[in-house]
Structure formats: C-alpha cells, structure tokens
Amino acid sequence: MELKNLIREIPNFPKSGIIFRDITTLLSNTDGLHYTIDILTEKCLEFKPDYVVGIESRGFIFGMPLAYQLNVGFIPVRKPGKLPAEVYSVSYDLEYGQDSLEVHQDAMPAGSRVLVIDDLLATGGTAGATTQLIEKAKCNLVGFAFVIELKELGGREKLPKVPIISLIEY
C-alpha cells in the first residue's frame, strides 16, 4: 500500500509557502490506518522497548495502538500544565519563540527502554526535547518512529544516533 497517496496536501497552510501534510485522510481510511499500525509494529519490534512515548497530540494517535501491539506501556508527553503529578519539564526553541514539554516523573522506571513516536519529523525540535525528558528520567532511548518525515528540514541530523523509522518521506 502506498501510504503517501492517503496524505492530503494543503497548500499555503498554516501560512503562505507551506504545504501542510494532513494525516486525517490516512486516519479515516480503514485499510490505511490498519496498515500504518501494522507496519510500525513490524518495524519497531526489533527495538524491544519497555514503553512507547507518544508526543502530544498526534503521537498519541499512533502511540497507543503501537504500544498495544508491542505489549508495552504507553507514556504521554504533554504540553505544560496537562499532567497532575510531579513532572520533568523541558523548554525548546521554535521558529518564533519557545515551547515546553512535560512527562510525569514516575511514568517509567530508570533504565527503561523507550521508543518515541510522533506523526511528523520536521526540524527535530519536539523529538529532541522529548529525548531530554527521557534523559532526565534516566531511561534509555532505543529509537524513534514517525509516520511522515520532511527530509529537507534536516530533523534527523539533530536527533541522537539511534534508529529512526519514517514510513513516508517528503
């Protein structure tokens, strides 16, 4: 199945000159969604993670079923103020400003093997910040999985030297 055919391209969104890669058309396609989760599972089995960490919010969409298929726990990485217990927090730079991500301090025991998933790898900022959260938790990053990778933005080069899976490349 050619997953790229299930991604809708919206020109000039969210601003002029940008082509937005819309995954909602993939999500609404039953066969495409099943195939996406199945191929992610197949490719991520070798990582042998203890946990799948999904980045808010679209990382949750793919992370939960992947964790289920891998028979491991799921850990949400959230925007600030969304988690009720003690958190590790990391700030990171955006094109115009800063943002932060958080994870519960007791979400995963030190030494756990962690796989990070998100829908899209662009500049690597969000995935890089998630890496810092995993380091604060004293866990071991075993790999990244992305549905889409925007190669021209060079995000892969900014991430730790662990395996990186992307199903669709632009």
Swiss-Prot record:
Catalyses: AMP + diphosphate = 5-phospho-alpha-D-ribose 1-diphosphate + adenine
Q: Which organism is it from?
A: Trichodesmium erythraeum (strain IMS101)
What's the name of its gene? apt
Quaternary state and interactors: Homodimer.
Q: What does this protein do?
A: Catalyzes a salvage reaction resulting in the formation of AMP, that is energically less costly than de novo synthesis.
Gene Ontology annotations for the cellular component aspect, listed alphabetically: cytoplasm
HAMAP family referenced in this protein's UniProt entry, alphabetically: Aden_phosphoribosyltr (MF_00004)
Q: What GO biological process terms does the UniProt entry carry, in alphabetical order?
A: adenine salvage; AMP salvage; purine ribonucleoside salvage
Q: Which UniProt keywords apply?
A: Cytoplasm, Glycosyltransferase, Purine salvage, Transferase
Query: Please, which domain of life does this record's source organism belong to?
Result: Bacteria
Which GO terms label this protein's molecular function in UniProt?
adenine binding; adenine phosphoribosyltransferase activity; AMP binding
Name the Gene3D superfamilies for this protein.
3.40.50.2020
Transcription regulation keyword on record: no
Q: Is this entry keyworded Transport?
A: no
Q: Which SUPFAM superfamilies match?
A: PRTase-like (SSF53271)
Instruction: Report what the protein is called.
Output: Adenine phosphoribosyltransferase
Q: What is its main location?
A: cytoplasm
Q: What is its EC number?
A: 2.4.2.7
Family in the record: Belongs to the purine/pyrimidine phosphoribosyltransferase family.
Location in or out of the cell? Cytoplasm
Its pathway?
Purine metabolism; AMP biosynthesis via salvage pathway; AMP from adenine: step 1/1
